[in-house]
């Protein structure tokens, strides 16, 4: 087992599927939008819209041009990785013990990828550094959703904020099917009262309902991560695509300094090996007009 892994290998089929399942369960983006397999070399999603309405043509009348607009969004997977040092006893562990370690690693890696998907797609940041990623560029909701599609957040009327976001989306010809809110906004909704009673009791005591009206609902700290002013992302998530390329390599590195850590130094010198996992995932916003953001006002302080 150890000698095979030391040369690098792929996750066994059931572990790879487990990663997919856990990402769907812990990423709000994944919850609101099912994944589409993305080829390793990327995929081009074509968008097509008819610019006008059908036209009545009188007998012997002339037909006019309704017009159509065609575009394309290219989705190219990018690579994310996670690595950590572990005791080299992993290399001599029994198969059962090694599988147990791999399953624990699988769960942890899945959680990191899930959170990373949200942070990258919503904010366009490198999850590890928290800084804007030049690799992602403007392929994120914070960059794409602007102008009248940004609703100013009010802690006293968070439900109205969502209604206002829905109005913007509907005016663009879409029907919102999903919403994810920051925990602060979920708490504000829970605190609303009418005639001395909770207005939305399904939010009481930290509850996160599966649906809000006809929309899939979730609450996640990734929305307001770091210093972000985002409080909610609302939209028609059929206008968003994301997915994995299939390979999920797990490499066990037995020597060297693969994490470039000058303090920890060589692996063999410290009886360690290095576990590194990589995933290839991509996403694309097919039409920014299908989405709206609720944002807190910028503080003057």
Segments from the language model and where they lie:
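Extended oligomerization regions of viral-like shell subunits
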Residues: 149-266
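Assembly/oligomerization interface modules of large self-assembling protein complexes
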Residues: 2-83, 107, 290
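Short loop/turn segments at secondary-structure transitions that flank enzyme active sites
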Residues: 51, 81, 90, 115, ...
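Structured loops at beta-to-helix junctions and adjacent beta-edge loops in soluble globular domains
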Residues: 48-49, 87, 182-184, 220, ...
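A short, structural micro-pattern
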Residues: 39, 78, 173, 211, ...
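Short helix/loop capping segments that flank catalytic or ligand/cofactor-binding pockets
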Residues: 54-56, 85-86, 94-95, 188-191, ...
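Alpha-helical scaffold segments that mediate packing/assembly in large oligomeric complexes
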Residues: 87-171, 293-294, 299-301
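Protruding loop/beta-arch "assembly-hinge" segments enriched in small, turn-prone residues
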Residues: 1-27, 253, 261-301
């Amino acid at each position: 087992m150890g000698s095979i892994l030391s040369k690098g290998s792929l996750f066994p089929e059931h572990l790879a599927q487990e990663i997919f399942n856990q990402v769907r369960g812990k990423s709000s983006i994944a919850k609101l939008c099912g994944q589409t397999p993305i080829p390793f070399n990327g995929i081009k999603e074509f968008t097509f819209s008819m610019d006008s309405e059908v036209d009545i043509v009188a007998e012997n009348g002339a037909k006019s041009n309704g017009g159509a607009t065609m575009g394309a969004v290219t989705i190219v997977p990018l690579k994310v990785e996670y690595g950590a040092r572990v005791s080299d006893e992993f290399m001599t562990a029994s198969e059962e013990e090694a599988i147990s370690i791999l399953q624990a690693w699988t769960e942890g890696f899945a959680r990191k990828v899930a959170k990373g998907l949200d942070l990258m797609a919503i904010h366009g940041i490198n999850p590890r550094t928290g800084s804007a990623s030049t690799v992602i560029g403007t392929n994120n909701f914070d960059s794409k959703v602007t102008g009248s599609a940004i609703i100013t957040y009010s802690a006293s009327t968070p439900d109205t904020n969502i209604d206002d976001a829905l109005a913007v989306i509907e005016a663009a010809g879409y029907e919102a099917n999903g919403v994810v809110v920051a925990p602060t906004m979920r708490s504000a909704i829970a605190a609303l009262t009418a005639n001395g009673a909770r207005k939305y009791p399904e939010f009481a005591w930290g509850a996160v309902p599966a649906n809000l009206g006809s929309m899939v609902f979730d609450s996640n700290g990734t929305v307001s991560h770091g210093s972000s002013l985002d409080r909610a992302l609302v939209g028609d998530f059929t206008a968003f695509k994301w997915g994995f390329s299939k390979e999920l390599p797990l490499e066990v590195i037995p020597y060297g300094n693969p994490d470039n850590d000058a303090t920890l130094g060589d692996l063999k010198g410290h009886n360690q090996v290095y576990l590194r996992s990589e995933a290839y995932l991509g996403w694309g916003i097919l039409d920014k007009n299908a989405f709206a953001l609720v944002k807190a006002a910028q503080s003057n302080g």
